[in-house]
């Protein structure tokens, strides 16, 4: 059982954020606020969500994309991070797992995920 002050603090951190509903297999576009010196800029990161873990303020998710020369790039983001400007769901993926770590071993067409039909 958590302390009531910690619960109040966490609720205050969560209430201002508008996080879309997404799960593993979805293709996301993240707008990340990057501070370089005294300037800030927005950098986009687009990839497949391969895992979500935790709950509350400490919830995180892993996004994987194929970078230059087919090098896989994975980044872990806290969902309620101040540096995340926005999260956009581009495609819903049809997967049967909650953790898609097997995509690390796949290349090219084998790494594709079917789109969820509505």
Swiss-Prot record:
This is Large ribosomal subunit protein bL19. It holds the Pfam family Ribosomal_L19. GO terms for molecular function: structural constituent of ribosome. Keywords: Ribonucleoprotein, Ribosomal protein. PROSITE patterns: RIBOSOMAL_L19 (PS01015). It comes from Campylobacter jejuni subsp. jejuni serotype O:23/36 (strain 81-176). Belongs to the bacterial ribosomal protein bL19 family. NCBIfam families: rplS_bact (TIGR01024). InterPro entries: Ribosomal_bL19, Ribosomal_bL19_CS, Ribosomal_bL19_sf, Translation_prot_SH3-like_sf. Disulfide bonds: none annotated. GO terms for biological process: translation. One of its GO terms (cellular component) is cytosolic large ribosomal subunit. This protein is located at the 30S-50S ribosomal subunit interface and may play a role in the structure and function of the aminoacyl-tRNA binding site.
